[in-house]
Curated annotation (Swiss-Prot):
NCBIfam families: ABC_MoxJ. Keywords: Methanol utilization, Periplasm, Signal. This is Protein MoxJ. It comes from Methylorubrum extorquens (strain ATCC 14718 / DSM 1338 / JCM 2805 / NCIMB 9133 / AM1) (Methylobacterium extorquens). InterPro entries: Methanol_oxidation_MoxJ, Solute-binding_3/MltF_N, TAT_signal. SMART domains: PBPb (SM00062). It comes from the Bacteria. The gene is moxJ.
Length: 300
C-alpha cells in the first residue's frame, strides 16, 4: 500500500506522523470513542478462524475497495487461496496509515498487505514485487521527462505530487514548490496536511494530467496504474530513477520492495504466507500485469 496512504515515507516519518496524529486524536475524545467502537465491532465480526486469513483493510482505491476489486484485495485473496484459506477483510474505517496501529497491533486482523519490506513496525514476508515512483505525462506531448534534473520541470505550468512523498521533497529541491503549493492545496480543498492525514486522490492526479491542468505528475506506480490504463487520454508512465539525489547529495530512493506484514511474534503465519507467496507467484504476476503496474526486480 502506497505512501499516498502513508507507507512510502521513510520509516521514521511514518512513526512521527502516526504519533502526531495520535496526539491530535487525544484532543478529539468523542470522535476517538466512535473509532474505538468501530474497531471493537470489527473485532467482533472477524473472530480468528483457522479457515480464514484476516486481512487488515482500509478503503483506498484503486488498491483496496470494499467490492474486493482493489489491487491489494485481489492479491490478498490469491495468497489466502494458496494457503487453503478464505480472505476475510477487516475494514478499519480509517486511512490505511493506521492499519498497523489500530488493526494489526490490536489483533482485530492478522496481516497488512502492501507494506515496504523494511517496515520496522512489523515482521514482513518475503517481497512479492517491487515498484516505484513514475513521471506521469500525456503521450501526445513532447515531454518525456526521465529525471528530476530535466530543466523542463522548471518551466511546466503545474506539477502534481503527493504530500509527504519523494515527489514533494524533490519539488521543493528544484525550487518550484511555492509555485505549485496553492494548486496542490486546491486539489484537497485547501486542507493543510499538518497534524491530519490529507492526500491527493490518485484518480484526481491522473485526471489533472490527462486534462492538461498539470503537465507532469509524480506518483507511486501502483496507485495510478489502473487509472492510467483506463484513461481515454493516452498517458505515459516513466520510472523515476532510483539513483535520484537532492541538490545537497542526499539519496532519494524511488522504488520499494512490497511485502505483507504480520505481528512481530507471529513467525508461524509469516512462514505460511511466504510459502503461499511462492505458490501464488504466477497469479500475482498476472494481476500486476493486468493492472498495468510498473514492476522492477525485487532487491532481495
Amino acid at each position: 500500500m502506497s505512501l499516498v496512504n502513508g507507507r512510502r515515507r521513510t520509516a521514521a516519518s511514518v512513526v512521527a506522523l502516526t504519533a502526531a496524529l495520535t496526539a491530535l486524536a487525544a484532543l478529539c475524545a468523542p470522535a476517538q470513542a466512535q473509532d474505538t467502537k468501530a474497531t471493537s465491532k470489527a473485532a467482533e465480526a472477524a473472530k480468528p478462524d483457522a479457515g480464514t486469513l484476516r486481512v487488515c483493510a482500509a478503503e483506498q482505491p484503486p488498491l483496496s475497495m470494499k467490492d474486493g476489486s482493489g489491487l491489494e484485495n485481489r492479491i490478498a485473496t490469491t495468497v489466502a487461496e494458496a494457503m487453503g484459506r478464505k480472505a476475510q477483510f477487516v475494514w478499519l474505517g480509517k486511512p490505511a496509515i493506521y492499519l498497523v496501529r489500530d488493526g494489526l497491533e490490536k489483533k482485530t486482523c492478522d496481516v497488512v498487505i502492501g507494506l515496504d519490506a523494511d517496515d520496522p513496525r512489523v515482521l514482513t514476508s518475503k517481497p512479492y514485487y517491487r515498484s516505484g515512483y513514475v513521471f506521469l505525462t500525456r503521450a501526445d506531448k513532447d515531454l518525456d521527462i526521465k529525471s528530476w534534473s530535466d530543466p523542463r520541470l522548471k518551466e511546466v505550468s503545474h506539477m502534481v505530487v503527493g504530500f509527504g512523498t519523494p515527489g514533494e521533497a524533490m519539488l521543493k529541491d528544484i525550487g518550484r514548490y511555492e509555485e505549485d503549493m496553492a494548486y496542490l492545496y486546491s486539489l484537497v480543498n485547501f486542507r493543510a496536511p499538518r497534524n491530519q492525514y490529507t492526500q491527493i486522490d490518485p484518480a484526481r492526479m491522473v485526471s489533472e494530467v490527462a486534462t492538461g491542468k498539470a503537465e507532469v505528475g509524480v506518483a507511486f506506480g501502483p496507485d495510478v496504474a489502473r487509472y492510467v490504463r483506463d484513461s481515454s487520454t493516452k498517458l505515459r508512465m516513466t520510472p523515476v530513477p532510483d539513483d535520484t539525489q537532492a541538490s545537497d547529495g542526499r539519496k532519494m530512493p524511488q522504488s520499494f520492495d512490497q511485502a505483507m506484514g504480520v505481528r512481530k511474534d507471529d513467525t508461524a503465519l509469516k512462514a505460511e504466507i511466504d510459502a503461499a507467496l511462492e505458490k501464488a507467484k504466477p497469479k500475482i504476476e498476472a494481476i500486476l500485469k493486468e493492472e498495468g503496474v510498473p514492476v522492477l526486480p525485487v532487491s532481495n
